[in-house]
Amino acid sequence: MMNKESFGACLLLTLPEDVFAVISRFLSPSDICNLILCGKSLCALVDSEKTWLVQCEEVKVLPLIELVQWRIGISSYKALCRFLVEVVKPLLGIWVQENPELGNVVYVMPGFLSVVGCRIIPQKVAPLWIQEGQVKWSPVFEIICGFDGSKGFFLHGRDKQGSFLYPGFVMDIEKSCNVLLLEVEPRSEKSSCNEIEREVGDPFGDLDFSDRMNLLDIVTKHVSLRVDEPLTGNLFPTRSKYDEAMMLERRNMLLKMLKFGGNWKHINLEEDEQLCYNHIEIDIKKLLENLGDDIDNMEDIEDQIEVTPRKKSFRRFLRSGIKHILGKFSSSKINSPSSSETRRSNRQSFLSSGNTFCLSLKASCTLMSSYEGWPIMSADNFSLHKLPMKKPLDHDVYAGLWGGTFGWPPGKDIEDESLLLLMLTYGESEEGSERILFGTKILSYFAEHPNGSSMFVVNIDTPSLEPFPFDTDGRDFEHSYTGEGIADGYGFRYPGSKPGSLFVSSNDLLAFVWQGTEDVITLQRINLGEILKKSLGSCVSPLLPTKNFTYTKRSYSNVFAKSSTYSSSSE
């Protein structure tokens, strides 16, 4: 008599492939993989391209036309689904850092078989900036999908010689990640391909900040790869066939760089092999074993270390960095013995936890508090923090990202205005009886109030009786609410405020007006992904690699706009 498992498998096998693909919409990727346990005869059904295309659609991060476009460069829709679920979906969104004060906004979006982190630069914009897509941005990092769905990481950066890419590993990406960390990762010799085995040792985050900074500087300097066009070209595909071919060529170049390092131009990429990252590590441990107690004798052993031929300047850089990490620290005279010993112990433990060291990107979920929609973050980590985004309720009609400028009416000013990006979120009053709308500033062109300040706080349940104080410019206002707008004060916890009103126009514009003044912010909802895909904006060269990921110093100037554009840097 046929057992239940075999009977169930036979029923599934009798279904047409198209019918099973429809049924699979109600299953998760893990459910489909588990069907193999019902019988080996189901393998062909489970591996069906139609079934996994449906699963890719159900992830809901790419439209169907782009899924088909991505399939060209990957072995199967099953491999593509793996990348979408493990990498793309958890990372998409807006990531921020508290420094510099003008704002540090990194928008993570799909590229071409990749995920790209783009920094929106503090800037002044033309009156019709949103229609024309005139936004300055800069690349921060990319995660590339291999032919089998595996993943590789590139940090973007530059130095005096031009633009560089810094390859590395992608560590664990948690599904509900809210912190993105740039780290140096120990690697064991027995690790193969893109797998890393951690030995017992203190994690990178336990090291002193200066040690972490110097390790990152050493490793990025070692693994850096000079790049020119087309590697610094467009990161986002269009529907043009020519563009598609260029994107595929660029992605193949990146895969070769991950696999072969500096020799990538002279070696063919085998598509049937898994990505193996053997040329993006630095053997710090072997170096240190040869150093002994005399750090100053590094010149005698430089030739024993396999490093990229980057002249003696890099050797001097490496030597000074190692001296700082393991040398005779003058800071021990200042620090207490217990603090100094703890620091040295953590350092030694970390450096003994692997045979080689590489650059890594890690996305983890940590317990993180927030203040009026702004995450409370540490300033001494090389990290980006995801803006907490609750799924808006049906009546949370204004929640989301809005952009705009000071002034009214929009689009009529002759001079460029400072771009403001505000994240609008809902909350409750302290009494819990009224709904509050917070307009949290995440980007501006001036630092009068720090990043994370609430530009306005509006009581959604209380209509405003104030008339709109300007010419309506032919627009009708459907709603208005009472609130307060930021004024004099200091910090984002203790700002001053003045009463004001939020006006909602019939064409989806918001205008917050400070009562008794002519100050007004005009906002419209924006889609950064669509703006960047238009390729009409200006791509600004990145900063030095570690600063490009996280700018750890407080600054009131526009540090991101000091670089020239790619076109000028490649001349």
Swiss-Prot record:
Transmembrane segments: none annotated. SUPFAM superfamilies: F-box domain. Residues 9-55 form the F-box domain. Signal peptide: none annotated. GO terms for cellular component: secretory vesicle. InterPro entries: At5g39450-like (IPR040275), F-box-like_dom_sf (IPR036047), F-box_dom (IPR001810). It comes from the Eukaryota. This is Putative F-box protein At5g39460. It comes from Arabidopsis thaliana (Mouse-ear cress). The lineage of its organism: Eukaryota, Viridiplantae, Streptophyta, Embryophyta, Tracheophyta.
